[in-house]
Design a protein with these regions (language model features):
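Patatin-like phospholipase
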Residues: 1-37, 45-284
Length: 284
């Protein structure tokens, strides 16, 4: 049986996902393939490496460290989140990522990135996070506060621009079961953003600008589609039981802990239903 898992992004809202995934680990929930977007990728790799609480731990420990994120870094490098410290020193030295366990896992992991030259989403298979750290940077490279990331000659930004919730990744491949972890409550719909700043910053990339301008439509259409599939029993959706009000790059440790703990609480609430969904062999 093929079980797919979709992980929405959302910057620090992604700690909700981290909490849910830690409940998955506690209950030995295994999936065949994962597709992550932005923070969904960054935090989701810890599920495959079987490192509960790591995503919460390194964020709580370093979010207020100027080496992790600072205006100085943004002015100097174009990255508000410091590349060398956050993506290299932390996972390689300070809070070591279990790269061996990840590579030995039977679960395949795909990172969603946005090709800024054609505006399309691409799904890059992550087989070795240590060697593919630039791809992990690319999936979470937020517009305006991140430099454009080049991987194998292609230019990328945050995967959520082109495909915030890539459920179609699994639909096209006829997976038996699809699990979706969202970081917004059921009532949330994205509003239109001003397009002036998009055109100013990225005038060389018209396809990217078009995606940014229409992102709210694409997002809302996907949410409606997921609701319909959920009603039909074709997907299992996990979403926050309350609105998550943290800022994208929240620095309040208490709030970060709350988001993670909400994920744990909501994960425990649905876990038995999830087990039943996965084990059910009837019509999809």
């Amino acid at each position: 049986m093929k079980v797919g898992l979709v992980l929405e992004g959302g910057a620090m809202r992604g700690l909700f996902t981290a909490g849910v995934l830690d409940v998955f680990l506690e209950n030995n929930i295994d999936v065949t393939d994962i597709v992550g977007v932005s923070a969904g990728t960054l935090f989701g790799v810890n599920y495959v490496s079987k490192q509960p609480k790591r995503a919460l731990r390194y964020n709580v420990n370093y979010i207020n460290d100027k080496r992790y994120m600072s205006l100085k870094s943004w002015i100097k490098t174009g990255n508000l989140i410091n590349k060398d410290f956050t993506y290299y020193k932390v996972p390689f030295q300070l809070d070591v990522f279990d790269n061996i366990t990840f590579k030995e896992s039977k679960t395949s992991f795909y990172a969603t990135v946005t090709n800024i030259e054609n505006g399309e989403a691409e799904f890059i298979k992550i087989t070795d996070p240590y060697k593919q750290m630039e791809t992990l940077r690319a999936t979470s490279a937020l517009p305006f506060i991140s430099e454009i990331i080049e991987v194998d000659g292609k230019k990328y930004l945050d995967g959520g621009i082109a495909n915030s919730i890539p459920i179609d990744f699994f639909e096209k491949k006829n997976y038996d079961k699809i699990i979706v972890i969202l970081t917004r409550p059921i009532s949330y719909r994205k509003k239109k953003s001003t397009s002036i700043q998009f055109k100013m910053f990225y005038k060389k990339y018209p396809h990217l600008v078009e995606k940014l301008e229409n992102r709210y439509k694409d997002y809302n259409e996907t949410v409606e589609k997921i609701l319909e599939l959920e009603k039909q029993g074709k997907v299992f959706v996990i979403r926050p039981s309350e609105d998550i009000t943290v800022k994208r790059l929240e620095k309040d440790i208490e709030k970060l802990n709350h988001v993670y703990n909400l994920g744990v609480k909501d994960g425990k609430h649905i876990i038995e239903n999830l087990k039943e969904y996965i084990s059910y062999k009837g019509e999809k």
